[in-house]
Amino acid sequence: MKKVYSFLLYILGLTTFAQNSNNEQFPLFHDCEGLVGKQQESCFYNTIQNYFYTNYKIPQELQNQQYKGTVIVLFEVDTVGNFKVLYADAAHELLKKEAIRVFESLPKVAPATYSGKATYSKFTIKINIPLVAPNSIDGNESTKYAKTNTLLIDNKKELSEYDNIQYKPFENPQFKSTGIVQFSHQNYGVFDALLNQVGSNNHTASKPYSYDEVAKYYDLETANQSFLKKKDSWWGRKLWNENVVAIQGEEYWFTLNPILDFRVGKDTESQASNTFVNTRGIIVNGGLGKQLTFTTSIYESQGRFADYYNAYAESIRPSGGNPAIIPGIGIAKRFKEDAYDFPLAEANIKYQPNKFINLQLGYGRNFLGDGYRSLLQSDAASPYPYFKINTTFWKIKYTNTYMWLKDVRDAVTIDGTYTTKYMASHYLSMNVTKRWNLGFFENVVWTNTNERGFDFNFVNPLIFYRTVEFGSSSKTGNALLGLTSKYKWNNQINFYGQFLIDEFAISDVKESNQSWRNKFAYQIGAKYYDAFKVKNLLLQVEYNQVRPYVYSHSNPITNYGHNNQSMGHLWGANFREFVAIARYYRGRYFADAKLIYGQRGFDFNDGTNNFNYGGNIYLDYDENRPYDNG
């Protein structure tokens, strides 16, 4: 792991740069001319404080009450040097009006400049009531203490740094940031049509998207404004319109919101009274400058599902005694007698040094494809740690993802510790024409055989993984190749598909004997936006077929899985599936309808028929295989 950290630091080091603050200048009053740097800043604030002390008139009725308090004013200096109050806050309206009057009477100044050009500048000032005469401090306090150790700390003195922190009105900066838009098919369906217009030069297969990618085609901020309700109370505004906590300052912002979700249902074939999911959580989003964004969310849930779902969750339970793994979430503990307690955490830190490259360090899931399912890399498994590099230029987007996965079976658990395995993939997406997109996918899974660890042979994003795999021993790695394609018939209809090769033997293809060694999968689908001229109605059909033994390996630990779940299609292998979906939304309301029909090949495991028919990706495909052909 030390090598991994060194590599990440090296990548980040390549993108750092220094900024020169000497090209910035504060607004200048006439008396401040000739000063430079911090002297300009001090003179600017001192002049305003002096002006307020001289000209601010406290209303007589407040003087009679011996009122004590503060007035906070957010103001700007425009490009010609005029002062303008943006926001004033005080306990009494008279105090705010007087502050605005004083600002309007301030003399015109030389505007702030950046790189020699006049620019707008914003400031915040705090005025104490009653007024206090500005004190001029001779010399720098820190210099005094540095020169001698005979000065005692003044317990009555307070620094003003905390009080001088400047805040701005929250302007929803996340909608224009490089932050991640949380992925779900329902959420992305709102703007999917606009991203898939003929002639667009984007890449929709690699998900999740960032806000700035979506904002080119869909105005997220305007859409958010259209959802707002007329609410005046604090509770009403926070419930319907605003973030519970939202802070924006100079070059930074962050939000914090609680998550509450309660669902109840009924399984008619179950003896349980009902099904339910009760979720509480918190989500934090933020940005530091324009290049660094972050998001993290923590969920705590209890739930009881339909009997068939409970049975599946328990069938993939981990080593160690926990009763189940909730698909797409993680390991669950027992809750009461027939329910589960399952936490979930996801996080992403994204650094974008320029418009071509972004680096992401996260704990979550990724998705490759334009369909409802993905055969290459889906979001069906539990979250995992990953490092991702996106490179976008010309007509190309190149995505490299390095993942740390877990095998939680009894057979590979040592001293209560689950086995770690590694996965590296790269996906090259190219817009061949204004209608046709073509993508190439390579992936390899390997383990810590012979203390191999994270093999840096796979870090090079341009290398052909299959060649490296055999150079490192084909028995300790598992490689897959894939192809994706999308064709935009017009702005309403597009067709998409995927083809995955796990293993392929040309000799068996020529014999047409349906050899088990020809392990491949494919997907075809179509989307119809604003179907039948109904605004915001999306219709989608999709067919998926995965042959037996796809995603599996002779050494099960190097299969295409994580936490006893498939990293590809969630059904694993040996199946056919047809999906039909209708989605409709209007304002805050949405409706989804899905029809899923499938045929799957299962193992019997009844003591007599214990063959491996190729559906369970956690079985060795060289053992108990009933047929080689057919």
What are these regions (language model features)?
Residues 4-14:
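Sec-dependent N-terminal signal peptides
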Residues 156-437, 443-448, 511-520, 527, ...:
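Outer-membrane beta-barrel channel domains
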Residues 78-81, 361, 428, 497, ...:
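Buried hydrophobic packing residues in well-ordered domains
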Residues 74-76, 128, 285, 498, ...:
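Residue-level recognition of well-ordered beta-strand positions that form the cores
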Residues 75, 87-90, 125, 131, ...:
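A mature extracytoplasmic/lumenal domain signature
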Residues 5-6, 18-150:
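Charge-biased low-complexity segments
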Residues 249, 342, 434-630:
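Exposed, low-structure sequence patches enriched in small/polar residues
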Residues 66, 114, 118, 287, ...:
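Surface-exposed coil/turn segments at beta-strand junctions on protein surfaces, enriched
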